[in-house]
UniProtKB/Swiss-Prot annotation:
Family: Belongs to the nucleoid occlusion factor SlmA family.
Quaternary structure annotation from Swiss-Prot or TrEMBL: Homodimer. Interacts with FtsZ.
Keyword Manganese: no
Annotated Pfam families: SlmA-like_C, TetR_N
Keywords, ordered alphabetically: Cell cycle, Cell division, Coiled coil, Cytoplasm, DNA-binding
Record feature DNA-binding region, as residue ranges: 31-50
GO molecular function, one term: transcription cis-regulatory region binding
Source species, domain of life: Bacteria
Entry keyword annotation includes Mitochondrion: no
Taxonomy of the source species: Bacteria, Pseudomonadati, Pseudomonadota, Gammaproteobacteria, Vibrionales
Listed name of the protein: Nucleoid occlusion factor SlmA
Gene name as annotated: slmA
Record's function text: Required for nucleoid occlusion (NO) phenomenon, which prevents Z-ring formation and cell division over the nucleoid. Acts as a DNA-associated cell division inhibitor that binds simultaneously chromosomal DNA and FtsZ, and disrupts the assembly of FtsZ polymers. SlmA-DNA-binding sequences (SBS) are dispersed on non-Ter regions of the chromosome, preventing FtsZ polymerization at these regions.
UniProt source species: Aliivibrio fischeri (strain ATCC 700601 / ES114)
InterPro entries: Homeodomain-like_sf, HTH-type_TetR-like_transc_reg, HTH_TetR, NO_SlmA, SlmA-like_C, Tet_transcr_reg_TetR-rel_C_sf
Length: 196
């Protein structure tokens, strides 16, 4: 008979932190004392799993990065049409934010305002990777389909990332009322008409 698997305390801590970021507490600085109370452990117990609060945030950032880029790779493997790839990548990013409001606070930098600069730098690197991915998809169009975009691919990629970041910021600013994927089909029709 298999014994029930004991929940991983490290994952519990990260889950609790993400939930706190999603709640009204996420609008303020989250202390380790509040987090320990939420998890139901002492602060010392938190530090047995993570040497610092920054490491807890790093754990969530690693989850964000792994979740997004593993799916990006799947999109690139499964889909070859440039515009479809862009559409799916945009939808992926917006849906990820919608499903993970607490993590979206991290991605906008809102939750990292009073934290270590290194954390904000990690988020910046994620967005730079996303922009690079858009740029690569756009540049490959010339090779795959034999036609270029009327505007430089770097400018288009920056515009696409700006749209995503704007949607994330609006979502956080509205206390998660304005869903990033709301009206996506109309949003995509407008955007795709501009970049063709």
């Amino acid at each position: 008979m298999a014994t029930p698997r004991k929940p991983n305390r490290r994952d519990e801590i990260l889950q609790a932190l993400a939930e706190m970021l999603e709640s009204n507490e996420g609008a303020a600085r989250i202390t380790t004392a509040k987090l320990a109370k939420q998890v139901g452990v002492s602060e010392a117990a938190l530090y047995r799993h993570f040497p610092s609060k920054a490491k807890m945030f790093e754990g969530l950032i690693e989850f964000i990065e792994e979740s997004i880029f593993s799916r990006v790779n799947r999109i690139l493997e499964d889909e070859k049409d440039t515009l479809k790839r862009i559409e799916l990548l945009l939808k992926l990013l917006l849906a990820f934010a919608e499903r993970n409001p607490g993590l979206t606070r991290i991605m906008t930098g809102h939750a990292l305002m009073f934290e270590n600069e290194r954390l904000r730098s990690r988020i910046n690197q994620i967005f730079e990777r996303i922009e690079l991915q858009f740029k690569q998809i756009l540049r490959e169009r010339k090779l795959r389909e034999g036609k270029a975009f009327p505007i430089d691919e770097s400018i288009l990629a920056a515009q696409l990332v700006g749209q995503v970041e704007g949607s994330f910021c609006r979502f956080v600013r509205s206390d998660f009322k304005y869903q990033p994927t709301e009206n996506f089909n109309e949003y995509w029709a407008l955007l795709s008409a501009q970049i063709q």
